């Protein structure tokens, strides 16, 4: 039994594993992992499943979907909204997801500047007049570095039970491999792209001559743009309606970066505090477990370690110390923590982010924590 095929051809039952739609989406995912585009647009995005899968690709910073049917997009677009976990642990990358309602036969400046444009099972739904305009909109106006177009291979239809004309009632046409490749090569030549052909949904053994169930053309621009198209190429008015936009929390936004830094600083400070107090307590005379005696024990440690505090502060020691009921943790000590260092980059930025968010000593060289609530 073939890897992508389950069932016997003679029974008239064909089942692809994974399902054919997943194979198409996984094909796009593999391209994204290989070429790492930052801006990706899916034309004919329908229920947004491909966009939902792509939002987990760490290289992508901008995702856009376009479909003629607003209702279909709205059914599942909630999956594109940030989750609580995205706010608790913001990503290092920025991510903006936008959905537009409109036709691929119309130009809109919101679709300029994309690295990759996908058209998965789209073109067979276009009217003849729309198909005529499609190449100019996608390859001429949008002009991304890469375009992926998939469409049914009509030669495979003889293996699909119940298919007499087209696979879907909304299909306006279905091409065989020669027809698709002729159209794709003409389009590629006209707009200075190269094109390679492949597909997903392998045929059963002995029927290889029909080709893949879904045929795919991968177009690559021969001379990638290094800057945005000039202003004169843009239409004066927007043609699409924006129906959804989500801006994901990112550490590139200083608000989220500050929250992450302060949270990590306080977590590390509490660990240092606990370690220091445990060390001081271990050096003192052993007492019973009576709470009062334990407090005396802590005070003994504090008093023993509080000598020459001012000298330590002036020298800006890199080690924490105790004065009275306060623990001083030098900021240099906290900044040396790898995660804090990675988040902030520089000590100056670190100090700026935590100022006003944590309690610092008079010369802002150390973070201050109270020992009073440590032993009750």
Swiss-Prot record:
One of its GO terms (cellular component) is cytoplasm. S-adenosyl-L-methionine binds at residues 49, 67, 103. It is found in: Cytoplasm. It comes from the Eukaryota. GO terms for biological process: piRNA processing; RNA methylation; siRNA processing. Transmembrane segments: none annotated. Binds 1 Mg(2+) ion per subunit. Keywords: Cytoplasm, Magnesium, Metal-binding, Methyltransferase, RNA-binding, RNA-mediated gene silencing, S-adenosyl-L-methionine, Transferase. Its EC number is 2.1.1.386. The keyword RNA-binding applies. SUPFAM superfamilies: S-adenosyl-L-methionine-dependent methyltransferases. It catalyses: small RNA 3'-end nucleotide + S-adenosyl-L-methionine = small RNA 3'-end 2'-O-methylnucleotide + S-adenosyl-L-homocysteine + H(+). GO terms for molecular function: metal ion binding; O-methyltransferase activity; RNA binding; RNA methyltransferase activity; small RNA 2'-O-methyltransferase activity. It is an enzyme of class 2 (transferase). Gene3D superfamilies: Vaccinia Virus protein VP39. Belongs to the methyltransferase superfamily. HEN1 family. PANTHER family: HEN1, SMALL RNA 2'-O-METHYLTRANSFERASE. This is Small RNA 2'-O-methyltransferase. It comes from Gallus gallus (Chicken). The gene is HENMT1.
